[in-house]
Amino acid sequence: NNLEKLIFPVGNEYGDHNDPLHLNDIQPVLNDSKFWKRGDIFMSLKQISLVLLYRPSTNKIIWHKQGPWVYQHDVDVINDHQIAVFDNNRDDFLKSEVKDSNEILVYDFEKDEIFSPYQIGFVKNEIKTPSQGLSEILSNGDVFIEETDYGRILRMDKNGKIKWQYINRAKNLKIYRTSWSRFLEENLYYSIVEKIANVNCE
């Protein structure tokens, strides 16, 4: 796909040559649209701040974008023309720290535009995990967030109001990481419960 130059950039003496890509998330495409086909896979390559769309049936990368996200995690398909990317927004040039906050960047394939619908809430609530992290935009517009390194999961509305949050604090008062948290909306939850109830394991 003529993207070899991204693996070991010229002059990158500080990069991790043992892990030049660091694939940290894949998101299978479940439905056809004008921009992708069922069976395609979105991939997040953290080390080079790249998100790509791979088509296994042809072994081709059919779309890719490097930045504006930095050291991103967790790509989600929102609808038939938009994806969401959890942007860690980490500055590793001078200090290894998050600039201002994390954010969710939405890329619109139809308009070739990127916007940040929850930025006010991310800044207000100081959501800034340096590594990992995930998010899911819910059907009513709220967003579920895992702030992995600080052991916090929360639900936040479009205006940045936290509806609830959980901090993974143990009896010794230390806070431990959360990892791969999931939020199930009601319709999906009851669908799973129904399927489990109808399973015959004999």
Annotate each predicted stretch with a short phrase.
Residues N1-E202:
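Histidine-/acidic-rich catalytic cores in large beta-rich domains
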